[in-house]
Design a protein with these regions (language model features):
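Iron-sulfur cluster-binding electron-transfer modules in prokaryotic oxidoreductases
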Residues: 1-205
Length: 205
């Protein structure tokens, strides 16, 4: 399973079956490789996850499409899944979500400015300049819709934005993981079998 990392997912989606397969001994219901967002989305579609979206009401969300995920890979069974699946997860876990301008998202997304080996403090000036197109789009949706946080599913993007957001008058905490939203909103209910076990323990006492 691929995590929230654009580079790792690009490699896994393109080459994992070729280099490390075949995976015919695994459950055929799950594609190999599978992104963590696909796995979470499948559970949501099956009704196996319950969320209290109000737990994320302190956030007004937008989403950054990371380069490697947006233009060098895919998710799910339909074209464009890499764009729609993360947004579906946000909508399932949050009450307030707004996309940035259409010309700045999905396959027209901007680089975060930290990829391609630039993620070093020695190149901070270049990184800040490289992030400007995304920062401008983010600032626009902040002004127009009151967005407070931006989610991303790439470790490089999240690290980059946590460093450069303050250069644009924003807080480093405004970039978050998609699955942070999942973790904050998920409702954990006890398994009925666990409850039966507790009853048995009480009877034994």
């Amino acid at each position: 399973m691929g995590g929230e990392c654009g580079d790792a997912w690009g490699v896994a989606e393109s080459f994992l079956n070729t280099l490390a397969g075949p995976w015919d001994f695994l459950d055929p219901r799950y594609p190999v490789p599978q992104h963590i967002c696909e796995f979470t989305y499948d559970l949501i579609q099956q009704g196996k996850l319950t969320f209290d979206k109000s737990e994320n009401d302190d956030k007004v969300m937008t989403f950054h499409d990371s380069c490697n995920v947006a233009r060098a890979s895919r998710m799910g069974d339909t074209p464009g899944g890499q764009f729609e699946i993360p947004r579906a997860i946000i909508r399932a876990t949050c009450n307030h979500f707004y996309d940035m301008d259409e010309d700045t998202i999905r396959d027209r997304t901007f680089c975060c400015g930290g990829g391609g080996g630039l993620l070093t403090d020695d190149l901070m000036e270049l990184r800040v300049k490289g992030a400007k197109p995304r920062m401008d789009a983010l600032n626009n949706v902040i002004q127009e819709k009151g967005v407070t946080h931006m989610a991303a599913i790439c470790a490089i993007c999240k690290t980059q934005f946590s460093k450069v957001l303050p250069y644009y008058g924003m807080d480093m905490s405004q970039i978050i993981s998609l699955h942070q939203l999942v973790g904050d909103a998920i409702v954990l209910t006890p398994d009925p079998e666990d409850a039966d076990d507790d009853d048995d323990d009480d009877d034994a006492d």
